[in-house]
């Protein structure tokens, strides 16, 4: 009986293996946090590099010697070694007459009833030459001499580690960047045309 009690006491006081058990308790949250930091760092890296690539391509394209397809290819080549498999890169280019008009509607020059919207009898500056009043008159493409070109890039990529769903996040990430550059004066900038509305379709 005494031997049995002593043996039981020795087992209860035995500390060997305690460190391993403690490590097992903290290992999962520690490695989850470590992977999260690495994933966040990768996202920041993609953001920084994609911004740098976009700025370089935009400067190169300002000479008017690059097509939209060549711009898209240059961006893809610049990010090819960086992004993961199954990632997609979307590049959007729109040209404007000047910086102040980026993303804005065409300017009304005559507002008959003063309501701030285009109505029959009103006139506006038809920046993109399509005879329609646009709330964002940007023209798809690389624009002409002295035009302002807005470049936007969207990188949709799988995360570095497929663990985001464990904490309710998406398994993919989206990184977006944009910049605007004035084209070089490689010719004469096209003048703006005033258009008057007779009827609304």
Language model region names:
Residues 1-79:
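Alpha-helical assembly-interface signal, strongest on the long, hydrophobic N-terminal helix that forms
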Residues 2-3, 55-201:
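Short, conserved structural patches
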């Amino acid at each position: 009986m005494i031997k049995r009690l002593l043996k039981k006491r020795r087992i209860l006081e035995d500390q060997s293996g305690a460190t391993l058990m403690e490590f097992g308790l903290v290992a999962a949250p520690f490695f989850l946090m470590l992977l999260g930091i690495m994933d966040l760092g990768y996202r920041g890296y993609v953001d920084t590099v994609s911004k740098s690539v976009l700025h370089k391509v935009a400067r190169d394209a300002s000479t008017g010697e690059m097509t939209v397809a060549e711009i898209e290819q240059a961006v893809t080549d610049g990010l090819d070694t960086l992004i993961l498999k199954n990632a997609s890169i979307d590049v959007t280019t729109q040209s404007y007459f000047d910086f102040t008009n980026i993303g804005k509607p065409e300017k009304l020059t005559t507002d008959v009833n003063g309501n701030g919207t285009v109505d029959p009898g009103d006139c506006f500056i038809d920046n993109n030459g399509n005879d329609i009043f646009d709330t964002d008159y940007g023209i798809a493409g690389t624009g002409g001499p002295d035009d302002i070109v807005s470049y936007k890039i969207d990188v949709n990529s799988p995360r570095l580690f497929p663990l985001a769903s464990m904490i309710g996040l998406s398994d993919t990430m989206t990184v977006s960047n944009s910049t605007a550059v004035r084209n070089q004066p490689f010719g004469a900038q096209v003048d703006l045309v005033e258009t008057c509305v007779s009827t609304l379709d």
